[in-house]
Amino acid sequence: MKKIYLYIVLTLVFCNFGFADSLRVVDGDTIVLNGEKIRFSGIDTPELKQTCMNGDEKVFCGKTAKMLLIKKIGNETPECISEGKDAYKRTLAECFVNGESLSSYLVRSGYAFAYRKYSKKFIKDEEFAKENKLGMWSMKFQYPWDFRKAS
């Protein structure tokens, strides 16, 4: 009887691993969830190698955006609503943790920008961060799209 019980428990444990969500944060606006590369729609974050200047101090604002996202997600699994694919075949989506938009959170924190070229959805969040000098709005920075053009 103990062997049967042990077999059932082990089977349930190993079956659950097959359904476990795999998550990797690539940068501030891109994750890989269960093998699918997801780009947060409507926002743009600094590139990982991009820096900002906080007075005389160089800050890796792209890495800071990534770390902020990792911290916000914690041990949760984001729920993403797909909005199609981009030119690089990534899924464009808005993702949520505990009902809160990760995109809105990043923009309101000042470590992402409303990507007006593609969406107007996060402009109020950006205005809030800018008015309150949050995140990059308290530093000298280059917009991510300008940084990519210059690189």
Please state what every model-predicted region is.
Residues 2-151:
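Small beta-barrel nucleic-acid-binding modules, primarily SNase/OB-fold domains
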